[in-house]
């Protein structure tokens, strides 16, 4: 059993005999039932640094969204020496480390695709060194080139028609959360020793493809751990041994995360479930009188500041999919342990308090793991932060814990993953709304007129018959599921081969569980369209080529989002039907297939390629995001809408079910206290029904309109809203996306 002087005062045995951070947490954390009265205001150091960072953010916005871009150096763990927010203020930085050599400067990361890396520079007026182009086209193959070398013509057609899109074939797949806590608890040397043991135990027998690959991967992981030590040493820190106090624990953990964001540009780069872990160190130092509450808050403020600075170079088409420059630096708070003890600590309050000390911000993506059994004080404080900032999201801990245990992280927007035990193969989403139109038109794309899907016989009747449409839809969605999975298998294979996440995987168990994450877009429109066909009369309108391009609806029909089982049960069918088709396919590396109802802001892009729908949605307009009902469909208030979404079984969409709702403050009450109490009641009632997720926005439409027209107002500089699975500064959205947000239902009554 290991013993380190840095562990003095810590309880437990198992975590000393094996890498087991969960056991360490369970044996040492102290649940907190009190209120927020203990919290401290920002220190002078925090105010100085945050003030400087805000100045840099204003410069960044004035320059079109990018402050600086690397054009000479390929990013890597040791590609840069130390960097600081401001050299003249570095004595105030309690947590150090930048992705590059300057704050908010975006790294050059060509391993996902050299073309993407070059375009992301050129889009903002930067010219990368031509030698880099030569290296990554002639001498070093990239993930993107590998994928496109292997794509079939059918895959290319589906990709360009946007029936499948957002694929991670030009950028890092992300959604892999290293257990960055391990760096603080064990130190790098011990982690390297354990990886060396894993290597020695791998391949004592037949050298199969899988064994050979695993030995290479473990070696890369071991090497990455060594590089982490060098990177930390450049800042004057020795992370070879465990952290001895709270300051080191925060710093060591951040160095682990910094290693990930220096080497990968994944769409989602979560930092994981770190709050309770860090609270153990902070509480020990508080008890020993070597740390004050002001200093504890300062550490969390500065870690949060670093999370707010995470930036990646992106191309225009990427920004259309994931608007507002998100990084999904997701931090999970709260939750209930499997032993029944809640896991709320003072540190969960401290992380939420950063939104008061430094104002609202989209990053980090603060996520409350919610249960009605959480302490009332904490629920009220989280609700207060929602009312004040609209910056946090809620996920149902009671729904996730049976599947993922009590030490899971949120690896992107809403998807859970067991920390340090598993990884996820991210796979964007398939457009089921467009799939329904393909079913009606026999695989012909309604926008291009090209044959993209299989040449199944389309529907020839003037009025749509429900049973016939279902039969056609079943065949077309089966084709789509097969093509989708094959495309993702190819992408994940090439990503492992050319853009392997060694730094992140070094902090995950070698015997890793893998999930295969698919996704669904256009969910509510498929429901409402099938409902219209079933309960009303839908007439087809064809162009001169005989393609159905529009529909006339005669009569009324139930819409998803009104707590009407007739529509809601169609939604359950749509989800289960597609998941079943995904599950019957072979998935790469024996990964476990899951799916999600989650679109991010790609609902706007998807909509541009999706024609008129039988539910009345107009062609080329945004699809409704995630699992949220169609715009304007909700006629019975917030609770009815929540009840509809709550009927979707989480076990059939383990990758996540995103629900975004906007509530006018007056719908919750006339004063802050009443609004907070009412929001807690809404959250308790909603999550007790078993749904997965809720984004909560508390503001009126007029504020959105004013922010769109007057983005220069100081009050809107950090105006943050929740969209599908993440938060974003409203003024960072394109006008088209701002209009999309404004068009969504804003509930004036509960």
Which residue stretches match the model-derived regions?
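Conserved catalytic cores of very large enzyme subunits
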Residues: 2-750
């Amino acid at each position: 059993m290991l013993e380190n002087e840095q562990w003095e005062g810590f309880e437990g045995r198992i975590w000393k005999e094996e890498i087991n951070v969960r056991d360490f947490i369970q044996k040492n954390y102290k649940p907190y039932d009190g209120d927020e009265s203990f919290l401290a205001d920002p220190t002078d150091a925090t105010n100085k640094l945050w003030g400087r960072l805000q100045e840099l953010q204003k410069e960044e916005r004035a320059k079109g969204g990018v402050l600086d871009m690397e054009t000479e150096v390929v990013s890597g763990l040791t590609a840069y020496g130390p960097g600081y927010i401001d050299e003249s203020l570095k004595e105030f930085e309690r947590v150090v480390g930048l992705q590059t050599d300057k704050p908010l400067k975006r790294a050059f990361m060509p391993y996902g695709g050299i073309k993407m890396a070059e375009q992301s520079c050129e889009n903002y007026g930067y010219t990368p060194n031509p030698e880099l182009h030569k290296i990554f086209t002639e001498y070093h193959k990239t993930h993107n080139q590998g994928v496109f070398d292997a794509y079939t013509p059918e895959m290319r057609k589906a990709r360009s028609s946007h029936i499948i899109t957002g694929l991670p074939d030009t950028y890092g797949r992300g959604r892999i959360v290293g257990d960055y806590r391990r760096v603080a608890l064990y130190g790098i040397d011990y982690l390297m020793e354990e990886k060396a043991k894993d290597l020695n135990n791998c391949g004592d027998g037949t050298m199969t493809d899988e064994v050979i690959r695993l030995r290479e991967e473990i070696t890369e992981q071991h090497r990455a751990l060594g590089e982490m030590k060098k990177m930390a040493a450049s800042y004057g820190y020795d992370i070879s041994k465990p952290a001895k106090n709270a300051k080191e624990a925060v710093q060591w953990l951040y160095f682990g995360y910094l290693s990930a964001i220096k080497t990968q540009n994944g769409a989602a780069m979560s930092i994981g479930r770190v709050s309770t872990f860090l609270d153990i160190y902070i509480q020990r130092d508080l008890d020993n009188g070597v740390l004050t509450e002001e200093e504890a808050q300062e550490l969390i403020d500065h870690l949060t500041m670093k999370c707010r600075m995470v930036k990646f170079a992106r191309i225009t088409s990427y920004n259309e999919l994931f608007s507002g420059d998100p990084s999904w630096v997701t931090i999970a708070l709260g939750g209930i342990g499997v032993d029944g003890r809640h896991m709320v600590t003072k540190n969960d309050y401290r992380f939420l308090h950063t939104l008061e000390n430094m104002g609202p911000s989209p990053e980090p993506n603060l996520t409350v793991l919610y249960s009605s059994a959480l302490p009332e004080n904490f629920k009220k404080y989280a609700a207060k932060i929602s009312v004040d900032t609209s910056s946090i999201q809620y996920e149902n801990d009671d729904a996730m814990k049976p599947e993922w245990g009590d030490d899971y992280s949120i690896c992107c927007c809403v998807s859970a993953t067991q920390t340090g035990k598993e990884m996820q193969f991210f796979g964007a989403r398939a457009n089921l709304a467009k799939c329904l139109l393909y079913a009606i038109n026999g695989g012909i794309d309604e926008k291009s007129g090209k044959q993209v899907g299989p040449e199944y016989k389309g529907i020839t009747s003037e009025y749509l018959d429900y049973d016939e449409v279902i039969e056609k839809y079943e065949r077309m969605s089966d084709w789509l599921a097969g093509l989708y999975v094959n495309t993702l298998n190819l992408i994940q294979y090439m990503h492992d081969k050319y853009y392997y996440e060694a730094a992140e995987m070094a902090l995950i168990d070698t015997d890793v569980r893998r999930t295969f994450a698919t996704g669904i877009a256009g969910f509510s429109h498929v429901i409402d369209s099938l409902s219209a066909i079933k309960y009303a009369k839908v007439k087809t309108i064809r162009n001169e080529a005989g393609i159905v391009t529009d529909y006339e609806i005669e009569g009324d029909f139930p819409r998803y989002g009104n707590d009407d089982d007739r529509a809601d049960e169609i939604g359950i069918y749509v989800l289960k039907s597609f998941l079943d088709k995904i599950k019957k396919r072979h998935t790469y590396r024996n990964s476990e297939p899951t799916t999600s109802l989650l679109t991010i802001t790609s609902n706007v892009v998807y909509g541009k390629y999706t024609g008129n729908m039988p539910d009345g949605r107009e062609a080329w307009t945004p699809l409704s995001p995630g699992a949220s009902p169609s715009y304007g469909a909700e006629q019975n208030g917030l609770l009815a809408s929540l009840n509809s979404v709550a009927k979707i079984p989480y076990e059939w969409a383990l990758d996540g079910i995103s629900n975004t709702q906007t509530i006018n403050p007056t719908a919750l009450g006339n004063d802050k206290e009443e609004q907070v109490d009412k929001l807690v009641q809404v959250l308790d009632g909603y999550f007790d029904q078993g749904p997965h997720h809720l984004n909560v926005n508390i503001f009126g439409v007029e504020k959105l309109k004013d922010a769109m027209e007057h983005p220069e107002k100081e009050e809107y500089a950090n105006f943050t809203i929740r969209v599908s699975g993440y938060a974003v500064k409203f003024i960072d959205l394109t006008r088209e996306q701002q209009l999309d947000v404004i068009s969504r239902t804003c509930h004036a009554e509960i």
